[in-house]
Amino acid sequence: MKVVIAAAGTGGHINPGIAIANKIKSEQPDSEIIFIGTDRGLENDLVPKAGYGIKHIGAYGVYRKPTIENLKRLIKTIHSISEAKTILKEFKPDLVIGTGGYITLSVCRAAQKLQIPYIIHESNVLPGIATKLMSKKAKYVMLGFKEAKYKLNPKVNTVVTGTPSNTKCLNLTTEQKDEKIKELGLNSKLPIILVFGGSQGAKSINTAVEDLVIKENNYQIIWAPGKKNFEEIKEYLFEKGKDIENIKNARILP
């Protein structure tokens, strides 16, 4: 089986795509899988590391605000449908899978024009515009949350799958675990909470956590607020009299 996976931009779109690809490979080792993305996003790092090839198209996210820049993005995205068609004609996939976001609109629209079956995976509770537009002709729309079903047309063929992930478990001895905790400068005798808002971070999570790390707690926090938020949080903590590199019960990682 030959499969094209459309995934671009953030880890929230790309990692589920990679997890789907890995599952297909585990079930059908002879399958051929390529990704379609842009030349700008995390896909250019994550997809090759996972062992898959990637092709690029010039798709962009389009905002609702009417500006010249937005018009340029729209024109490029419309043109990217033709670029996607060229890739699909060359690769001749049996199935196209979109993981949401602007890339799904371009690639699934191209698949639709070429009469190639496509499915969509939507990880969010609130489906994006691309998912809403392309869901009506999709073979299936797989949902991360059952609530998302009620935001789509009732005629859409949905199935709740949850969000696929690449699970990797480490079997550490107590001594190894304590050593890793020590490397982080934390106390192995206190509970440790991991706070992670995805590759871009999550503003609501960061807002809730930033004051917690200042307090003296009977637990410890490992916090990954996202690269784009790191400097802002560093400044906020500095204003509160805290050095981000030297908070007793917290380790904050970009």
Residues covered by each model-derived region:
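Short amphipathic alpha-helix
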Residues: 13-24
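Active-site-proximal region of nucleotide-activated glycan assembly enzymes
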Residues: 32, 53, 112-178, 186
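Glycine-rich phosphate-binding loop signature in dinucleotide/nucleotide-binding domains
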Residues: 28, 86-92, 186-188
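Glycosyltransferases and closely related glycan-assembly transferases
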Residues: 83-96, 104-119, 132-140
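Donor-nucleotide binding loops and adjacent catalytic segments primarily
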Residues: 41, 46, 50, 175-182, ...
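Conserved nucleotide-sugar phosphate-binding/catalytic loop shared by glycosyltransferases and other
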Residues: 3-8, 27-76, 161, 227-229
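Glycine-rich, highly charged phosphate/nucleotide-binding loops
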Residues: 72-87, 176-179, 253-254
